């Protein structure tokens, strides 16, 4: 699973200019262990349309914090300088790409997605407030999102559909 995660991140350009480029795939093995914890197992069937979703959103925020905590403070050798560096910044983009690619319960907060959120007056920082706003957007557009899921053979989660939609909006000039 760790190798699959590494390949997935590489395919989305997440290794480029990143501390991950200086590590092999086993560096993220503890992240896979975090993702596989029982307390996060319900996120694999995350339903943004259900009522009383706050507990699920708080669980997602807990997962975010655990992933970030693992990476923060780890060291790597800086390319070209052979200096040991300490990881001091773990981006929302990296964390959300990991969660989207494994559990499918959040969109990926990359530059185009965030740009589209802001155009729609939605908070562009991966936090509880932003997720609440995205969930409200999902509920307001439930019919269209479910139609897209069905059209794509239910291969994508509702949050992946939201991710793709906002990414397309964000990339437009």
Short names for language-model regions:
Residues 1-86, 104-173:
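An N-terminal alpha-helical hairpin/helix-loop-helix interaction module that forms a charged
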Residues 100:
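C-terminal substrate/ligand-recognition segments
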């Amino acid at each position: 699973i760790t190798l699959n995660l590494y390949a997935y991140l590489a395919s989305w350009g997440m290794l480029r200019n990143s501390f991950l480029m200086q590590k092999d795939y086993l560096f993220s093995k503890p992240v896979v262990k975090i993702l596989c914890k029982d307390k996060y197992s319900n996120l694999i069937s995350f339903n943004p349309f259900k009522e009383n979703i706050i507990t699920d959103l708080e669980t997602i925020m807990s997962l975010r914090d655990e992933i970030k905590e693992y990476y923060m403070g780890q060291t790597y050798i800086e390319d070209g300088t052979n200096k040991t560096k300490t990881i001091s910044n773990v981006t929302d983009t990296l964390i959300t790409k990991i969660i989207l690619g494994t559990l499918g319960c959040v969109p990926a907060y990359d530059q185009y997605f965030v740009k589209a959120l802001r155009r729609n007056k939605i908070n562009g920082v991966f936090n509880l407030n932003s997720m609440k706003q995205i969930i409200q957007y999902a509920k307001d557009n439930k019919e269209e999102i479910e139609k897209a899921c069905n059209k794509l053979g239910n291969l994508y989660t509702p949050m992946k559909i939201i991710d793709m939609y906002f990414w397309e909006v964000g990339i437009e000039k």
